[in-house]
Amino acid sequence: MEVVLIFVYSLLVPVVLASAAKEKEIDPFHYNYQTLRIGGLVFDVVLFLVPSCHLLSHRCKCSFNQKPQDPGDKEAQVENFITANAKEPQKAKN
């Protein structure tokens, strides 16, 4: 019985050594932290500058500078324009 156990354990020794050798292999994936850091900083700068330039260029059509208009204001302007034109005397064409 002891001889059988020694034989079985002797068969397991190469398996254990092979698994230990696999653990010592260098991981082929290597993090390049410097490039990752620079890329992140560039991304942050772009995300900061694009909206800032957009707001500073005054092309943003923000509504805080405009007065609120009533829906009837446009119609009132058209009616005033029509009545103003009707009051002017028409010139005779000769």
UniProtKB/Swiss-Prot annotation:
Q: In the record, which residues are listed under signal peptide? A: 1-18
Q: Where in the cell is it found?
A: Membrane
Per the record, the major location class is membrane
Entries under Gene3D superfamilies matching the protein: Single helix bin
Say yes or no: keyword Nucleotidyltransferase present.
no
Please state which protein family the record places this protein in.
Belongs to the FXYD family.
Cellular component annotations (GO), alphabetically ordered: membrane
Positions in the Extracellular compartment: 19-34
Instruction: Tell me where the transmembrane regions lie.
Output: 35-58
Q: Does the keyword NAD apply?
A: no
Which domain of life does the UniProt lineage start with?
Eukaryota
Instruction: Please list where the region (Disordered) is annotated.
Output: 66-94
Please give the name of this protein: Putative FXYD domain-containing ion transport regulator 8
State the UniProt keywords alphabetically. Answer: Ion channel, Ion transport, Membrane, Signal, Transmembrane, Transmembrane helix, Transport
Protein's GO biological process: monoatomic ion transmembrane transport; positive regulation of sodium ion export across plasma membrane
Membrane topology annotation:
Single-pass type I membrane protein
An MF annotation (GO) of this entry: sodium channel regulator activity
